[in-house]
Amino acid sequence: MELRARGWWLLCAAAALVACTRGDPASKSRSCSEVRQIYGAKGFSLSDVPQAEISGEHLRICPQGYTCCTSEMEENLANHSRMELETALHDSSRALQATLATQLHGIDDHFQRLLNDSERTLQDAFPGAFGDLYTQNTRAFRDLYAELRLYYRGANLHLEETLAEFWARLLERLFKQLHPQLLLPDDYLDCLGKQAEALRPFGDAPRELRLRATRAFVAARSFVQGLGVASDVVRKVAQVPLAPECSRAVMKLVYCAHCRGVPGARPCPDYCRNVLKGCLANQADLDAEWRNLLDSMVLITDKFWGPSGAEYVIGSVHMWLAEAINALQDNKDTLTAKVIQGCGNPKVNPHGSGPEEKRRRAKLALQEKSSTGTLEKLVSEAKAQLRDIQDYWISLPGTLCSEKMAMSPASDDRCWNGISKGRYLPEVMGDGLANQINNPEVEVDITKPDMTIRQQIMQLKIMTNRLRGAYGGNDVDFQDASDDGSGSGSGGGCPDDACGRRVSKKSSSSRTPLIHALPGLSEQEGQKTSAATRPEPHYFFLLFLFTLVLAAARPRWR
């Protein structure tokens, strides 16, 4: 009888063990068919993809509950999620660069066309208006326009000195042409040059051109240069690689729901923002100087209008040149007398002809040209675009979450919070590197800013200072603002209020969300939801039953 009782004990214990091992119908592993379909659609082999959920102790990024992912699948999806984010960043960068390039080319082409039209008018009208005074000096005029183009394009020229040298050379050549009967050696011409400022042989034209051209050209080229620097900054920042911590966080954001067997769960909005704010923390630090640059560019467009504005002045250079030659011819006799008085009587040239009595006058209409409205339209479009992209760097995480990360439309019990389907409770971090010290999703070392981005912040500062100088009409030294080495090492320290803080740590208390049961959620699904954070209870029950079996069998072993 005692043996029969022991047998029943053993039989019951064995049945209990089998039942616990197989589980009740509600706790059977879910199918991975949907995950297999999505995984295969991304070009991966399905040979090692499980048909149903398996234990997830092997996972290194995703929660280690029941899973549809093997280690290889997790690694493949992690690499794929990183490439998807990199592609999204590059696409956004290219779109912004294209916007800036469109504005740059439109306005740059317009200013260059104005200068080309001015030179073409000069070439067409001056031969008939001034004869040999122009045709024998075409190279001097051609060189002037060439240097104006170089200056506009950002060459390191001093415009006032360039214009002064042009007028000095032109005065020497024209004075000799107007007095072919005189011998004018170099020392005599040097004396002429020294008296030129007091004699004002070209009237007010040189001074007017200098004052207006300096302000007009520096305003035009600083605006175009600003567009170029902005585009170059965007291009270089797009080349900054994602940190390994970011790659892990993005995998968890995008594909751990698939591994968890809930591929339909889309990332919670605040969860997505925290991940990308951590990933793009350095990029957000561009915001302040980026805004300063765009504000300065909008402001400098005020210098494009009116009689001293860039549009009128650049397109009217030939008119001041014509006015200058007219003044020289008008004042020829008075000028000659004053030069002889100051420099002495020059010798007569025995081979020279007599003074040309027939004075040729320009027939150019010197009235102000009416605006075609082209520049107004281009500038209006550019200013609107610049205002639209002012918050580009700090809005980038939200934009990517909305457009590229298939973010859930609302933060509710049905979105993916990084562990399961449920609400995401941590607060959203601020913008920039210093604000990521407590980011619950991405481990960010706020004491180590990205040096490439710090260099680009310095480039924005340099360009902004040039624009502000240009607004005041100053002839700014336009060395290449896109030089990779410029500003190297500058701005590399952490912000004053953040120095001394250490790398951010993920707080389990702030990270673990509360899990709310969904309507119709089975007991099996509820258990699997929390599998990553607590042990399965039936393991304790198995241990208890196994102890009973040993106790029942002990007398038999004696």
UniProtKB/Swiss-Prot annotation:
Record-annotated disulphide pairs: C32-C68, C62-C256, C69-C259, C191-C343, C246-C279, C268-C415, C272-C401
- Give the membrane topology: Lipid-anchor; GPI-anchor
Tissues in which the protein is found: Nervous system.
State the compartments where it is located: Cell membrane; Endosome
Report keywords, A-Z. Cell membrane, Copper, Disulfide bond, Endosome, Glycoprotein, GPI-anchor, Heparan sulfate, Lipoprotein, Membrane, Proteoglycan, Secreted, Signal, Zinc
The Swiss-Prot or TrEMBL record annotates one GO molecular function as: laminin binding
Q: Which residues form the propeptide?
A: 531-558
Report what the Swiss-Prot or TrEMBL entry states about this protein's PTMs: S-nitrosylated in a Cu(2+)-dependent manner. Nitric acid (NO) is released from the nitrosylated cysteines by ascorbate or by some other reducing agent, in a Cu(2+) or Zn(2+) dependent manner. This free nitric oxide is then capable of cleaving the heparan sulfate side chains. N- and O-glycosylated. N-glycosylation is mainly of the complex type containing sialic acid. O-glycosylated with heparan sulfate. The heparan sulfate chains can be cleaved either by the action of heparanase or, degraded by a deaminative process that uses nitric oxide (NO) released from the S-nitrosylated cysteines. This process is triggered by ascorbate, or by some other reducing agent, in a Cu(2+)- or Zn(2+) dependent manner. Cu(2+) ions are provided by ceruloproteins such as APP, PRNP or CP which associate with GCP1 in intracellular compartments or lipid rafts.
- Name of the protein in its database record: Glypican-1
Organism expressing this protein natively: Rattus norvegicus
